[in-house]
From Swiss-Prot:
<keyword id="KW-0274">FAD</keyword>
<comment type="similarity">
    <text>In the C-terminal section; belongs to the DAO family.</text>
</comment>
<keyword id="KW-0285">Flavoprotein</keyword>
<feature type="region of interest" description="FAD-dependent cmnm(5)s(2)U34 oxidoreductase">
    <location>
        <begin position="273"/>
        <end position="680"/>
    </location>
</feature>
<keyword id="KW-0808">Transferase</keyword>
<keyword id="KW-0511">Multifunctional enzyme</keyword>
<comment type="similarity">
    <text>In the N-terminal section; belongs to the methyltransferase superfamily. tRNA (mnm(5)s(2)U34)-methyltransferase family.</text>
</comment>
<dbReference type="GO" id="GO:0050660">
    <property type="term" value="F:flavin adenine dinucleotide binding"/>
</dbReference>
<dbReference type="InterPro" id="IPR006076">
    <property type="entry name" value="FAD-dep_OxRdtase"/>
</dbReference>
<keyword id="KW-0489">Methyltransferase</keyword>
<keyword id="KW-0560">Oxidoreductase</keyword>
<feature type="region of interest" description="tRNA (mnm(5)s(2)U34)-methyltransferase">
    <location>
        <begin position="1"/>
        <end position="267"/>
    </location>
</feature>
<keyword id="KW-0963">Cytoplasm</keyword>
<keyword id="KW-0819">tRNA processing</keyword>
<keyword id="KW-0949">S-adenosyl-L-methionine</keyword>
<dbReference type="GO" id="GO:0016645">
    <property type="term" value="F:oxidoreductase activity, acting on the CH-NH group of donors"/>
</dbReference>
<dbReference type="InterPro" id="IPR036188">
    <property type="entry name" value="FAD/NAD-bd_sf"/>
</dbReference>
Length: 680
């Protein structure tokens, strides 16, 4: 693993603590897993006609049930989404320690390869959902860590793909109270069942717990039962209670409409405008779901906009409060990191090269204000050490392999990635999975909505109709009438390319302070970047080149290696990133601003205005979506934002909570005011 376990801060719990929190279900793993596999095969057989089977599991245990679900899924025409809820977060190092010390995998060697694949994704001990994708999307595992009721209640019910079946592990069975049962029911199909392990043994459910599950409309059965019933309808009263819960959720978040679901019968029903990281990853996430796309790129090849830099830092944005922004970026960073690993480690000939190095990112302060901010971030939360940990000046020097003589915050799983190669690799993988048509040198000048769908218009051609159109066109996001009111701003960024020489060439990690500096790649370091709002041109700027150098001198004054930074070649690249005021990307339905203003004029002076905006879906352009505003951290945020939009378009469970989805809503700037009864 990248996060080195030999550092004291990396080891927080020993094996006795772990085995107490994540107990094995049975002493005889081989015998138990044989029975478990038979049960799981019955579950898959009972739902064999579903293209996506969504299953829930309460408790991680020692992880063998999870691995067994994965192994048992053999239907090539079915995808599996397994949602595992575990109150005690665990990281990859601890999971490996648990398996090694218990020798549980040694008893079932057929799971060893899957276990190694799982560890390779580096699960981390963060609160919230971590989405792990395997086998080109055939198996997806959502790890929901933290208080189970909070995790369940934060999720949106998926009408098209609800949870069909639950497995409850013994160590959690009697700790699940009535509110948890109802939240499980809210997310479930009306005919979903619950299976328990050891129902008739001392380790099984109490009669009270069984009654509570049944009171929520679940049929509860031991996993050794010979039959999996798929259609035990709850009585009308219990069914009504479930529907009430779902309506309450829908009403509370009515202002944030979800995407209309794609028709699987329309092979070219979605168009993506843009040729960068966002569009390529959206195409990949849709391809994993069997959905074809058409991509329209104005340039001769991908990655010529903000995705065109040689190197970009990939690490999470943390806040002292660990609020929705911070939690989103942790989830997104980890998802993106896993994407890089999956794309570069696939078996030949499906492997796609991406220049990258997860060498860590070392964040340091550059003045008194930034030091106070960094100290506040470090001290305000008990951050998982695989996310970040504090280092003193000596440790920082060792990590950087050059002297910086400053303490800092080290992100051990972070590093740098080549953005345009990342975009190209995502598209290549998408094209391996399904039909993805790429239109290069095709600049869309206008989009037009007719009754039959959307049309894309160039100087010479008219494409369409498309049921869905996604604007993922970076700096040109606001070029169309339907998107020109988006509250988002362009910022110019000039990245300097400097030769790797002398002490500078020894840099071993990404430095982030006032600007950033990467280790060398193909003989050059990247140093940047300028930050100029609403630029008038994208030409090379000598002043910004010197400003980039000055930022390094301000960040690490009097260090000898600074003299090795040679700017004389005037080698640089200029791009534009689109930035929102709250630093969240934009992902979701395109707002109909004209209609918002019209509705506002009718409701702004009424006492009921706040209630109106709270309970009324915000006006949107039907079939038009936004994926942009990735700012300076698109490498971290872009792939997960694309995955979530793909899940919405296909009517699948989304790996984000309701509050975070509202933060990503392109409508959010107006709605924040309207929901508070304030003037626009």
């Amino acid at each position: 693993m990248t996060a080195e376990p030999n550092k004291p801060c990396q080891i927080k719990r020993d094996y006795p603590q772990l085995i107490n929190l994540y107990p094995a279900t049975a002493h005889n793993d081989a015998h138990y897993l044989s029975k478990l596999s038979i049960y799981q095969q019955r579950v898959f057989e009972a739902h064999s006609q579903q293209k996506l089977l969504v299953l829930g599991q309460m408790g991680l245990g020692n992880g063998l049930e999870l691995l067994s679900w994965w192994r048992t899924q053999t239907n090539p025409n079915q995808r599996l989404l397994l949602k595992v809820f575990e109150p005690n977060p665990i990281n990859a190092y601890e999971l490996k320690l648990l398996w090694d010390q218990s020798a549980s995998l040694a008893k079932v060697p057929e799971l060893e390869l899957l276990a190694q694949c799982l560890l390779h994704t580096e699960p981390t001990a963060i609160i919230g959902c971590q989405r792990l994708i395997f086998d080109d999307g055939r198996t997806t595992i959502d790890l929901h860590f933290g208080d189970i009721q909070s995790q369940l209640s934060s999720l949106i019910h998926s009408p098209l793909h609800p949870v069909q079946h639950w497995l409850v592990l013994p160590h959690l069975q009697n700790g699940l109270h009535q509110q948890i049962h109802w939240q499980m029911a809210k997310l479930s199909d009306d005919s979903a069942t619950v299976a328990t392990i050891g129902l008739n043994e001392s380790s099984g459910l109490s009669e009270t717990t069984v009654n509570r599950f049944q009171a929520c409309g679940f049929e509860v059965r031991d996993f050794t039962c010979a039959e999996i019933q798929t259609n035990p309808q709850p009585d009308a009263i219990l069914l009504h209670e479930r529907h009430v819960l779902r309506r309450q959720d829908a009403k509370a978040y009515a202002f944030n409409p979800m995407a209309a679901i794609l028709s699987s019968d329309a092979p070219s029903s979605i168009a993506i405008i843009g040729g960068g990281l966002a569009s390529a990853h959206l195409a990949l996430s849709l391809a994993e779901r069997g959905q074809s796309t058409q991509i329209f790129c104005k340039d001769a090849k991908l990655g010529q906009g903000a995705s065109g830099n040689r190197q970009g830092a990939i690490y999470p944005l943390l806040t002292p409060e660990n609020d929705e922004l911070s939690r989103f970026f942790q989830q997104a960073f980890l998802f993106s990191r896993r994407r890089v690993q999956a794309l570069t480690s696939a078996p030949a000939p499906n492997q796609t090269p991406i220049s990258h190095n997860f060498c860590g990112v070392l964040q340091t302060a550059h003045d008194e204000r930034s030091q106070l901010r960094l100290d506040k971030i470090i001290q305000s939360q008990n951050w998982p050490s695989e996310i970040a940990y504090r280092v003193d000046a000596q440790q920082a020097n060792c990590l950087a392999n050059i002297n910086i003589d400053k303490s800092g915050f080290f992100y051990p799983l972070a590093g740098w990635v080549c953005p345009y190669e990342y975009a190209e690799a995502a598209l290549q993988k998408a094209q391996q999975l399904t039909a993805v048509k790429l239109h290069l040198e095709t600049e869309i000048l206008e989009i037009e909505h007719q009754s039959e769908g959307w049309y894309l218009i160039t100087a010479k051609h008219r494409f369409g109709p498309f049921a869905q159109v996604v604007l993922a066109n970076g700096a040109a996001l606001t070029q169309f009438d339907a998107s020109n009111k988006l509250q988002i701003s362009p910022f110019r960024g000039q990245v300097s390319h400097v030769p790797a020489q002398f002490q500078l060439s020894q840099l071993a990690t990404v430095l982030c302070a006032n600007g950033y500096l990467t280790p060398s790649h193909e003989g050059l370091h990247c140093l940047g970047a300028s930050y100029v709002k609403e630029p008038k041109h994208l030409d090379f700027c000598p002043q910004e080149q010197q400003e980039n150098l000055a930022k390094m001198h301000e960040s690490y004054p009097n260090q000898p290696w600074l003299e090795d930074i040679d700017m004389s070649g005037n080698n640089a690249r200029v791009g534009v990133r689109m930035v929102t005021r709250d630093h969240f990307p934009m992902m979701g339905c395109a707002p109909d601003v004209a209609q918002i203003i019209k509705d506002y004029a009718e409701h702004q002076l009424t006492k009921e205005s706040r209630h109106y905006w709270q309970t009324t879906p915000a006006p949107v352009h039907e079939g038009l979506y936004i994926l942009g505003g990735l700012g300076s951290r698109g490498l971290s945020s872009g792939p997960l934002a694309a995955e979530c939009l793909a899940a919405q378009l296909c009517g699948e469970p989304i790996p984000l909570d309701k509050a975070t989805l509202c933060k990503l809503n392109p409508n959010r700037m107006w709605l924040r005011k309207l929901l508070k009864g304030k003037a626009l």
